[in-house]
Amino acid sequence: MAEGVFPGAIGIDLGTTYSCVATYENSVEIIANEQGNRVTPSFVAFTPEERLIGDAAKNQAALNPKNTVFDAKRLIGRRFDEESVQSDMKTWPFKVIDSNGAPLIEVEYLGETKTFSPQEISSMVLTKMKEIAEAKIGKKVEKAVVTVPAYFNDAQRQATKDAGAIAGLNVLRIINEPTAAAIAYGVGAGNSEKERHVLIFDLGGGTFDVSLLHIAGGVYTVKSTSGNTHLGGQDFDTNLLEHFKTEFKKKTGADISGDARALRRLRTAAERAKRTLSSVAQTTVEVDSLFDGEDFEATITRARFEDINAALFKSTLEPVEQVLKDAKISKSQIDEVVLVGGSTRIPKVQKLLSDFFDGKQLEKSINPDEAVAYGAAVQGAILTGQSTSDETKDLLLLDVAPLSLGVGMAGDVFGVVVPRNTTVPTIKRRTFTTVADHQTTVTFPVYQGERVNCKENTLLGEFDLKGVPPMPAGEPVLEAIFEVDANGILKVTAVEKSTGKSANITISNAIGRLSSEEIEQMVNQAEEFKAADEAFAKKHEARQRLESYISSVQQTVTDPVLSAKIKRNAKAKVEAALADAFSTLQIEDASADDLRKAEVGLKRAVTKAMSTR
C-alpha cells in the first residue's frame, strides 16, 4: 500500500448479512472486494490455523458452523436476556454466553476457547471493509462514516461507534441507513433540488426501517422514522428453512435440528431459493447427502414462499402507517416511495407497498444493496471538506431521534424529555422534584422507548444527583437536561437549581457498554490477530513455494535427460538436501522462516550440482 493517509472518510454500510464500502474522490465509487464482489458477507470464521472474514468465512460455514459467526448486528448493544437474543440463539450454530448480562460469542480459535463481544466481531468486519477501501485507494484510511438502522437505540449506536474504534477508525458520524439512502436517491439521481416528500422503505438482511423525508434545495429533513431492528431477509430464510426441515422429516423421518452442518447447508439452499423466486415463479432445491446419506430435493413455488412469510410481509406496512401518522401527512402527499435493502427485491413486498399507496409506481432508480454506503460516502466527503460538486457542497442533513428519551419517575412512570422524531442534534429540559421529605439524593434512571411503564422501555443507565438541600417533598427544583448529538447518542445532566449542584452521565455504565480501557485492550488484541493472520499467510505462501520447488527438483532427479545434467558424485547431495527439505515440510508448525531456509538450502545444493559442462 502506498504511503500517506486518505484525507477523506470512507462510507461503510455495516449490514446484518452483507456490508458495503464506498469512497468519494470527485464522485462516489462503490469498492469491490478481492473477489470482485461489491458487497461482502458480514461473516467471521475462526479455525485452528487462521481467522477468515467475508466471502472466505461464509464459503466454509457448512464445514465449520460452530466457529463461523454472523448476525453480530442482532447482538450489538443488546442484553443477553432480551427476547430477540434468546430466540436467535435457538437458530445460531455458534455459542452465545452470558457475561454479567451482556452476550459474548464463544469459539475455538488457534486451538483455544476464546470469547468475543459483538463489538469485536463487528470491528473485524469493519476492518475488512477498511482494508478493501485501502487496497483501492492506495492510502491508509483513518476516518469513516458508519451507518446504523434508524431505529437503533442509544446502546446499539454507542456499541457500533465502539466497534469502529476497535477497528482503528475515527467514526466521524453514525448516520441512519434510510437517511443515507435518501442522499443516494437525491444526489445520485439528481433529485436533491426539487421539493418533495420521499418515503424510504429499507428492508435488509436483518433490520427494517421506514423514514419519511422532506427534500428541498439540498436540505434533507427527516420528518419521522419507524421500524423493526429485528426483521429482514434472515427471518424469511428461517421460515423457509423450517418448511424444508418439515418436508425432509416427512420424507425420511429424520430431524436435522441438532445437526449444525446440515442446517447451514439447508439454510444456504433456502437463501438461494428465496433469491431465485424474486425472478421466477418456481424453483427446485437440491442438497446432496444432507443427513445420514439422504439427499434433499423439493420444489418451492413463489406463492408457497409468500404464504410461508405472509405475516412478516404484511407487518412491514405497520411502520409505513406509523411514519405517515407521526408526520401528519396523508399517503397521497408522498411523491416517491424509494426501495432500499436486498429484501425489497421480493415481488410480494413490492406489491403490498404499491397497493398501500393505491397502485403507485415504486422508485427503483438506486441500487438497493449499495445506496446506503453511497450516502455514507457523500456524508464522509462533506464532513472532511472533500466534497467537490455543488450538489453535495450545500447538502444539509436534519435527522431525528427514533425513540423517546426520558426519566423514570415515581411509580415507574416514564417522564418523556425528548419526544421521538425530535430533530437532532437537540437539547431538551424538563423539571422534576423530590418524592420524599428531606431527600438529599435523587436517582435519575434514563430510559428510551414509547411505553408509559418504564419496565417496558430500555434502561440506558442511571446516575445520582447528591447534595440536594433537605426540603419538604415537592419543593426542590431539579432540572434534567438531555443533549442528543448528531450521532443520536445521549448525554444527560441534572441540576439542582438553588445550589447549582449538578451530575451527569454519558451512559457508560449500561450493560455491555465498553469502557475506554476495554476498547484500548480490544484495539491491541485486534492488532495481534492481524499480525497472526499475516504470519499465517506468509507461512502458507512459504509452504506452497517449498512444495512446488521440491516437486520440480524431484522431477529433475528422476528424469533421465535432466538428471544427466547433474555433476557426477553430486546426486547424493541433492537427494540428501531434498530429504531435509521434505522433512521440514512434514513439520506441521514449521515457521515461514524455517520453510524459506529449507527452500534456500535445496536451491543451493541444486545450483552447485548442476553441471556447467
From Swiss-Prot:
Residues 403-613 are annotated as: Substrate binding domain (SBD). Residues 1-391 are annotated as: Nucleotide binding domain (NBD). It is found in: Cytoplasm. GO terms for biological process: translation. Its main location: cytoplasm. It catalyses: ATP + H2O = ADP + phosphate + H(+). Ribosome-bound, Hsp70-type chaperone that assists in the cotranslational folding of newly synthesized proteins in the cytosol. Stimulates folding by interacting with nascent chains, binding to short, largely hydrophobic sequences exposed by unfolded proteins, thereby stabilizing longer, more slowly translated, and aggregation-prone nascent polypeptides and domains that cannot fold stably until fully synthesized. The Hsp70-protein substrate interaction depends on ATP-binding and on allosteric regulation between the NBD and the SBD. Binds to ribosomes. Binds close to the ribosomal tunnel exit via contacts with both ribosomal proteins and rRNA. Directly interacts with nascent polypeptides. This interaction is dependent on the ribosome-associated complex (RAC). Interacts with SSE1. Interacts with FES1. This is Ribosome-associated molecular chaperone SSB1. The gene is SSB1.
